[in-house]
Amino acid sequence: MSSGNDTPPRLAISLLTDFSLLSDFQCGIPEMDRFIQSRFEDSVAHHFCIPYSVHIDDKVVALFALNFDAVILPEDYKDDLKLGATAFGVPGISESYEDTFWSKWHYPAIEISYFAIRKEYQQRQIGRRLIEEIVQLARRQNIGGCQFVTVEAYRKPGYSAEGFYRKCLFSRCADPDPVGDTIRLYRFLY
């Protein structure tokens, strides 16, 4: 796992086609682990998302899945964007496109539908590196327009992923649902 120097290990990202590679995958969150072991493959089979595995050498150390999404921003959230009161600052919108951008009622996005790091590989900056890889994937994809990356960050008593995503420049896209298990976050791509 560690080569004795400060060079982070190479992360190899590929489409996940062999779900048996996940047979011993555990991220340490029981609900997510159960989902990965029993229902993740069904989500993929029913075209909900495209799965990716992340390897260091020959070991799956993380997985994520992506699907298309849209960001609907209420006016007060647009005001926050205009003022730069988000984790990612003011969007890089040209002056000629500004009126068009702010008049939209929804914006194209790619959602991180699932994201998990193998328990023994957590706290090694792999998650942050993967978020940046996902941002680059979203920027490079050429199937449709994409201005944001979104995620429903898992949050329950005793565990919340919101802090991790905020460190990765995500901001709240909606107020938290007091009875829900997730909080919707977004990050501007440009």
Q: Predicted segments — roles?
A:
Residues 123-137, 167:
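Conserved acetyl-CoA-binding loop-helix of GNAT-fold acetyltransferases
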Residues 65-114:
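Conserved acyl-donor/pantetheine-binding loop and adjacent beta-alpha core of acyl/acetyltransferases
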Residues 144-146, 151-175:
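Conserved active-site alpha-helix within GNAT-family acetyltransferase domains
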Residues 105, 118-129, 157:
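Conserved glycine-rich acetyl-CoA-binding loop
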Residues 49-53, 63, 109, 114, ...:
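Short hydrophobic/aromatic beta-strand element in the GNAT-like acyltransferase core
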